[in-house]
Amino acid sequence: MKIMVLGAGTMGAGIVQTAAQAGFEVVVRDIKQEFVDRGIAGIDKLLSKNVDKGRMTAEDKAAVMGRISGTVDMGAAADCDLVIEAALEVMDIKKAIFKELDSICKPECILASNTSALSVTEIAAATGRADKVIGMHFFNPVPAMKLVEVIRGASTSQATYDAIKDLSVKMGKSPVEINEAPGFVVNRLLIPMLNEGMYCLMEGVANAADIDTSMKFGAGHPMGPLALADMIGLDICLKIMETLYKEFGDPKYRPCPLLAKMVRANKLGRKTGEGFFAY
């Protein structure tokens, strides 16, 4: 099986690395060559660390990197068996990508989206192969996180679901079957909890460090909600909350004003060096 991953950012590169380590030939595509090069260089750096720590041999690393190629040409999807989209979490962007892929890819090619909250059914409507469109939601950092949410759209076929479930297992993941709903399972439960932590901070209930300490030692969480939001990216948290609020129309999903304020200030968490904590 040949796989294309669209997007060489953190999630895309993680998917590329995981697929290549599982033995698949992978091509990563992004809109600029510098993005592609940066993504592949990041994979190389992470694998080098694994070699240094004795987790893999130099020969194994070379074999993995040999299965990875990069391009800016969307036409490279023509001979792929699966395309996994890991682009921006914006519906119009995803629909445009899937419409283009539908015109390029061979009829039997499966088109998967790594969307964290958007409708697979709506994305699939941009194509003429809705039965072969599916959600394949990985979690960051992809090489380490075992879960993949496999999301059925309204028209996703059983054959498509079975193929992606089997692939997820071959990639060393534990797939869970999701019938499409806003936020799926993890983000529907997780992101509102993070959002509530932000309300606690905004309302002066406790400071950021104490909020996180409370959830780590009081609820057994490995990471506090505000540090976790910083790791996910506050812009991503905001988009997910906006999606939940829009789809459900329930005030409990209203994004915290402090979250929106921080995103406007480009304080997005770890990736910008500052969020609820400094990095």
Curated annotation (Swiss-Prot):
Keyword set, alphabetical order: Cytoplasm, Fatty acid metabolism, Lipid metabolism, NAD, Oxidoreductase
InterPro entries: 3-OHacyl-CoA_DH, 3-OHacyl-CoA_DH_CS, 3-OHacyl-CoA_DH_NAD-bd, 3HC_DH_C, 6-PGluconate_DH-like_C_sf, 6PGD_dom2, NAD(P)-bd_dom_sf
EC number(s) given by UniProt: 1.1.1.35
Pathway assigned to this chain's UniProt record: Lipid metabolism; butanoate metabolism
Presence of the UniProt keyword Secreted in the record: no
A family per Pfam: 3HCDH
PROSITE patterns for this protein: 3HCDH
Gene Ontology BP annotations: butyrate metabolic process; fatty acid beta-oxidation
Source species, domain of life: Bacteria
Sections of the chain in a coiled coil: none
Subcellular location as annotated: Cytoplasm
Induction statement: Highly expressed during syntrophic growth with butyrate (at protein level). Seems to be constitutively expressed.
Main localization, broad class: cytoplasm
UniProt GO molecular function: 3-hydroxyacyl-CoA dehydrogenase activity; 3-hydroxybutyryl-CoA dehydrogenase activity; NAD+ binding
Gene3D superfamilies: N-(1-d-carboxylethyl)-l-norvaline Dehydrogenase, domain 2 (1.10.1040.10), NAD(P)-binding Rossmann-like Domain (3.40.50.720)
Catalytic function, reaction form: 3-hydroxybutanoyl-CoA + NAD(+) = acetoacetyl-CoA + NADH + H(+); a (3S)-3-hydroxyacyl-CoA + NAD(+) = a 3-oxoacyl-CoA + NADH + H(+)
Gene Ontology CC annotations of this record: cytoplasm
Keyword ATP-binding appears in the UniProt entry: no
NCBIfam families membership: PRK05808.1
Family: Belongs to the 3-hydroxyacyl-CoA dehydrogenase family.
Record PANTHER family: 3-HYDROXYACYL-COA DEHYDROGENASE FAMILY PROTEIN, 3-HYDROXYBUTYRYL-COA DEHYDROGENASE
Function of the molecule: Involved in syntrophic growth of S.wolfei with butyrate, as part of the butyrate oxidation pathway. Probably catalyzes the oxidation of 3-hydroxybutyryl-CoA to acetoacetyl-CoA.
Protein name (database record): 3-hydroxybutyryl-CoA dehydrogenase
